[in-house]
């Protein structure tokens, strides 16, 4: 049993590492430095139109794995509000990195949608991994 638990944890660790690498590739390293600049602090400013709506869906989907896997890795993030806050902080870190490296626009809409995605993933994880009574 211990071997199987360690094996499962190792597998989850590898998945988390791959997920974080993919997030950084998609949100930062895939873009040329200095190619995108700007700050959007107005909530819902980027919504509307098919392309913008696709970005909304993309941002939500991008963070569902965060909410799903991260609480399984770190016990301190197993409560829903804590996990959602961690998703917010991770999203904020990405947006600040994009701003500082000029590899993306800093948008509060992205932070909101990413946080929603982390929350959805956390709820799915809580339901999926709930212990039976």
Model-flagged regions — what are they?
Residues 1-108, 122-133:
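Bulky hydrophobic segments
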Residues 112-120:
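Small-residue-rich transmembrane alpha-helices that serve as helix-helix interface/gating elements
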